[in-house]
Structures are given as C-alpha cells and as structure tokens.
Amino acid sequence: MSHIFDASVLAPHIPSNLPDNFKVRPLAKDDFSKGYVDLLSQLTSVGNLDQEAFEKRFEAMRTSVPNYHIVVIEDSNSQKVVASASLVVEMKFIHGAGSRGRVEDVVVDTEMRRQKLGAVLLKTLVSLGKSLGVYKISLECVPELLPFYSQFGFQDDCNFMTQRF
C-alpha cells in the first residue's frame, strides 16, 4: 500500500485507546475507493476529482516539500475512511531556519461524529508536529469551533484574511 508519508513516523503518535474497528494511518493511494473524496466533500467543495486526478495529486504531494502529513481514520467494519486531517510542514528562514506546521482539512463523517475522532486526529497531529520539530502549529477555523480547538492547546491568536479565486 502506497502511503503519502512513512507510516512508521506516525505510529508513536497514535493514541492507544481507540476502539478496535478504527485504524489511524497515513492517507493511502487506494483511499479514493474508500470514500476519501466523499468525506472531504462534507467539509468543502472538492470539484471534479476523478481517480486519475486524485492519484496524480497524491504522488505530487507525496514527493514534495513542504511535507504533507495527511492522516485518516478507517473504519474496518465498513472499509471506509471516516475522518481525516492534514499537517502541512513548511520550511522557513525565520526561527533559525525552522519549520512551521499548519493543520488543515479536519473532517469527520457526519455519521461518525461525537465519537472523539476529531480529538484523536488533533492529538496525533500535534504530537507528530512536535516530533518533527515545528516551532508552531496553526489552523484556521470558524468562530464556533474555537472552543473545540482550544482543548488541544490552540489559541485565538490573530486576524486571518483571505482572497478566493
């Protein structure tokens, strides 16, 4: 199975108290067939992304810098990806040529919410980020989710602006 990053890097950061039917692992190339894109569409517009385009983007992300650490939770009962979040690590010249982490695309399937899968993903990514030596991890969220993310050490830190095209 082709993963987006080395699974052994992730293993020490996965909480041990997961139910047996949930497996935390890096995104795999065959997750297209396990509903990964459908899961992302619960978060935002995915656009026209067929399997060929997914696999092409997967390979580009797998081999590029910054490093994309996309983590999924698979339900072994249904063989579906039911939750996902990404830690993007970008290199900087500031902070002694340090690296910054950004948590992105946090999503839990609507039918699997309230099972603390989002918490599992965030704890995993924060632990992974620390081990990778990032000097900070940031994320953007809607105001309603500030209390949720603050449970994991995130603080409302500054204004965020965007341009969409």
UniProtKB/Swiss-Prot annotation:
It is an enzyme of class 2 (transferase). Acetyl-CoA binds at R114, Q115, K116, L117, G118, A119. Pfam families: Acetyltransf_1 (PF00583). Keywords: Acyltransferase, Transferase. CDD domains: NAT_SF (cd04301). It comes from the Eukaryota. The keyword Acyltransferase applies. GO terms for biological process: UDP-N-acetylglucosamine biosynthetic process. Residues 22-165 form the N-acetyltransferase domain. Pathway: Nucleotide-sugar biosynthesis; UDP-N-acetyl-alpha-D-glucosamine biosynthesis; N-acetyl-alpha-D-glucosamine 1-phosphate from alpha-D-glucosamine 6-phosphate (route I): step 1/2. Signal peptide: none annotated. This is Glucosamine 6-phosphate N-acetyltransferase. It comes from Caenorhabditis elegans.
